Amino acid sequence: MSEFLTPERTVYDSGVQFLRPKSLDEFIGQENVKKKLSLALEAAKMRGEVLDHVLLAGPPGLGKTTLAHIIASELQTNIHVTSGPVLVKQGDMAAILTSLERGDVLFIDEIHRLNKAVEELLYSAIEDFQIDIMIGKGPSAKSIRIDIQPFTLVGATTRSGLLSSPLRSRFGIILELDFYTVKELKEIIKRAASLMDVEIEDAAAEMIAKRSRGTPRIAIRLTKRVRDMLTVVKADRINTDIVLKTMEVLNIDDEGLDEFDRKILKTIIEIYRGGPVGLNALAASLGVEADTLSEVYEPYLLQAGFLARTPRGRIVTEKAYKHLKYEVPENRLF
């Protein structure tokens, strides 16, 4: 996949902190999530209580990290940021937990990747605001209970199915983020252009939005590249011609597909007669890992209606045939 279209963070996402919304009012899209979060925040503030623990689930690039920072901002408290993979030992987690002040937000990205020992230490911390740590080794080792300040855990995950039931059940607020509409992405792009001090035409913003795979991170990334083209051609505003020139350089078509996306669909059509084809067989034909294919490449193709999963395997849809200008087979069930 093109580095410009991956929803994961890349080096092309540096220097965009100033584009992030600082409050729920500035945050575009995810209306249901915002309503639930706004209610919980307002109630906690009115009662003078610590906010319930929050789980933010959804595909990468949809604003989970931004929402975590907004939660801390709305509560006017400190945020401590870490991620599941870096918390290797219980001591790593204990050091963070004992440094928290009342009402602080602890944000753990990729919380589904916590190892079991660290996760188990977290249970008593988020439920009773206490932790038990072992002092010493061998027969003389003893457990000491330490009280910690009440805090709010905000966990983010792209794979909520990998969360253990005991951990998931300890979150009082579970929010599922979904892909954005073209209309919402257009507003995000126009806001970003304004903050970058660049004028953009409405049609140009919509053109970028349609190629952004329902993901704000991609929309911002593409907008930055379009701004580069604007600078090079010495124009005074972003119009559709400038967007098209940029997308041609990036090899991104009008449906937001890049070269490898098209290769996936063409492989199924040309080698497997449109499918069905099993994940492992398709991955072998493409020379990629099966997990990479299912977790990185497939979500957008499924969401956009180019690919479908059946009990027998993957099939391409009529939309894919038409987009790639293949003749649609007769008597084919899609």
Swiss-Prot record:
Amino acids binding DNA: 309, 314
Family annotation (CDD domains): AAA
Top-level taxon of the source organism: Bacteria
Gene Ontology cellular-component annotations: cytoplasm; Holliday junction resolvase complex
Region (Head domain (RuvB-H)): 256-334
Region ranges (Large ATPase domain (RuvB-L)): 1-181
Gene Ontology biological-process annotations: DNA recombination; DNA repair
Molecular function per GO: ATP binding; ATP hydrolysis activity; four-way junction DNA binding; four-way junction helicase activity
Temperature optimum or stability note: Optimum temperature for ATPase activity is 80 degrees Celsius.
Keywords: ATP-binding, Cytoplasm, DNA damage, DNA recombination, DNA repair, DNA-binding, Hydrolase, Nucleotide-binding
EC number: 3.6.4.-
InterPro entries recorded: AAA+_ATPase, AAA_lid_4, DNA_helicase_Holl-junc_RuvB, P-loop_NTPase, RuvB-like_N, RuvB_C, WH-like_DNA-bd_sf, WH_DNA-bd_sf
Gene3D superfamilies per record: 1.10.8.60, P-loop containing nucleotide triphosphate hydrolases, Winged helix-like DNA-binding domain superfamily/Winged helix DNA-binding domain
Protein name per its UniProtKB record: Holliday junction branch migration complex subunit RuvB
Organism from which the protein derives: Thermotoga maritima (strain ATCC 43589 / DSM 3109 / JCM 10099 / NBRC 100826 / MSB8)
